[in-house]
Amino acid sequence: MLLSLLNSARLRPELLILVLMVMIISMFVIPLPTYLVDFLIALNIVLAILVFMGSFYIDRILSFSTFPAVLLITTLFRLALSISTSRLILIEADAGEIIATFGQFVIGDSLAVGFVVFSIVTVVQFIVITKGSERVAEVAARFSLDGMPGKQMSIDADLKAGIIDADAARERRSVLERESQLYGSFDGAMKFIKGDAIAGIIIIFVNFIGGISVGMTRHGMDLSSALSTYTMLTIGDGLVAQIPALLIAISAGFIVTRVNGDSDNMGRNIMTQLLNNPFVLVVTAILTISMGTLPGFPLPVFVILSVVLSVLFYFKFREAKRSAAKPKTSKGEQPLSIEEKEGSSLGLIGDLDKVSTETVPLILLVPKSRREDLEKAQLAERLRSQFFIDYGVRLPEVLLRDGEGLDDNSIVLLINEIRVEQFTVYFDLMRVVNYSDEVVSFGINPTIHQQGSSQYFWVTHEEGEKLRELGYVLRNALDELYHCLAVTLARNVNEYFGIQETKHMLDQLEAKFPDLLKEVLRHATVQRISEVLQRLLSERVSVRNMKLIMEALALWAPREKDVINLVEHIRGAMARYICHKFANGGELRAVMVSAEVEDVIRKGIRQTSGSTFLSLDPEASANLMDLITLKLDDLLIAHKDLVLLTSVDVRRFIKKMIEGRFPDLEVLSFGEIADSKSVNVIKTI
């Protein structure tokens, strides 16, 4: 029979809860014998211990999502049990062995001591634990519900960007909904504990006052006997109810104060974080032994505690020293263990399964003789800071490495460990940006460096100051190096700036402009936004004003499906900022593309279902480039701030065609000219 019942309970565990609820309701009405009350009291204590241990060892809050319902059931069970014990105390002056034992154990030989101990337990539960847990639950529920729309938008954005699939999005939404419901339930469930504590206090006074009255009138006891008997039973009954209630209250405190994201159980997290810092341990050990030397303090006790802390410090210090001794890469990963065998160029990688497949985004190879000076000058930090100011993008960590075989004036840029560009920078000289042949007439013989089709002129610092007074623009070596690196990094932005980085920028924007971002994401995926930003950056247009870009996207993304045309519309919206970047004061010096040249470009534009591209025959393309080169070469030497001005429909094609020969020449459309800027057309091609 017993085995059959246990098997039924195993197959349908919900029957146990159903039986328990029926029993609880019956206890409110039906008188129970003392032996059954003892069993139910023991069951109450066991359930409280079970809930306590379960809450302590959960790895996340949703692992115990039924806790609010458990609170309701255990609270009802304790109240029903208190009613049954009160009935026995008042009618029979006997509530079973457990209550009598608890009362005798706590009271001992003194009623006053018993009352004080019981009062302390009640105060601790009601004022400290219950009130604190209730407040934490209220705040957690409020923040969880307030943050739900933002989390929902984040899931939708990840789904649109292709970072997660539909199943993963569905699972995340389910978890988010369950968390919100759980925190909302906690806010109300904590009232069960508070109400239970108040009811327990009232029941104690009823048992004490009513018991003495019933004992003297019904059982014929004198005042002394009634006081002794009913005090013992009242305190015993109160403790039997309050101790399980205290365990449940502590369990609730454990759960509501747990931080989501901690992977281990609470005990492990507490010990790991409390004893993680060796410095804290050794200082605490010293303070502990110092306290033991105070007059009247038991020195052996403090010595033992100090020794325990010192032992913990020793193990933690040894562990930290061992970890520090292991060489690490810049990202904190273990370096590859590569052994080259004699006669073979093949390398052997130790523990291949733990090797990251990531490449290093940005590396600068610098001359060995210059590396220390460049590190002192904080080249990497300055590059990242200034690039963010100029372009609005946070560069990945920039690593400086010794460049084998580099001369003292060469710098090599690697993007994702692939060589992109080599720059020549004379660190002891200054570069003349707007050089002209007039410089020679001042008795200055510049150092000339030819890089590609461009010439760079360098002079000494004394000569540079003289030229600056005459109106020439000069850059020191670090500024010139930054300029060269920034142009190359902007041109290759798609190598290190993509969907994930775009998502990070959008998350920051969401905190200030959630409605704007929501409107943009209705019509543009994160991938599409990422491509727009890449195209802007590749032409040296800053994306720091993300609000303006998002406003333009919200306006044009529903109408324009082609990303290239969409970028042109956004550039038009950013006209004031683009003109400010490339204009000389209030004037924009420009070389205008003639209508004849634009017509040649238009005739070569080909459109497919996937993209639009320029397809000129080789002869026409060569003739056009020769014409542009002839017109621009001399002008660009005399005017470094020139831009090429053309119609919006051919702008991007002209830019693509000339960027190999004139990488620093900006091509603007008429729609990108701000009203506040005047245009000085120097020449027409």
Curated annotation (Swiss-Prot):
What happens after mutating residue 448 to T? In strain: RKS2985, RKS2993, RKS2995 and RKS3057
Cellular component GO terms held in the UniProt record = plasma membrane
Q: Does the keyword Acetylation apply?
A: no
Transmembrane ranges? 17-37, 39-59, 61-81, 110-130, 197-217, 235-255, 274-294, 295-315
User: What are the UniProt keywords, alphabetically?
Assistant: Cell inner membrane, Cell membrane, Membrane, Protein transport, Transmembrane, Transmembrane helix, Transport, Virulence
Variant or mutagenesis effect after changing residue 306 to A:
In strain: RKS3013, RKS3014 and RKS3015
Look up and give the membrane topology term.
Answer: Multi-pass membrane protein
**Any one GO BP annotation for this protein:** protein secretion
The record gives the effect of mutating residue 407 to S as:
In strain: RKS3013, RKS3014 and RKS3015
Superkingdom assignment? Bacteria
Check the record and name the InterPro entries matching this protein: FHIPEP_1 (IPR042194), FHIPEP_3 (IPR042193), FHIPEP_4 (IPR042196), FHIPEP_CS (IPR025505), T3SS_FHIPEP (IPR001712), T3SS_HrcV (IPR006302)
Q: Where in the cell is it found?
A: Cell inner membrane
The UniProt function text for this chain reads: Involved in the invasion of the cells of the intestinal epithelium. Could be involved in the translocation of the InvE protein.
Q: Which family does it belong to?
A: Belongs to the FHIPEP (flagella/HR/invasion proteins export pore) family.
Any idea what this protein is called?
Invasion protein InvA
Which source organism does the UniProt entry give? Answer: Salmonella typhimurium (strain LT2 / SGSC1412 / ATCC 700720)
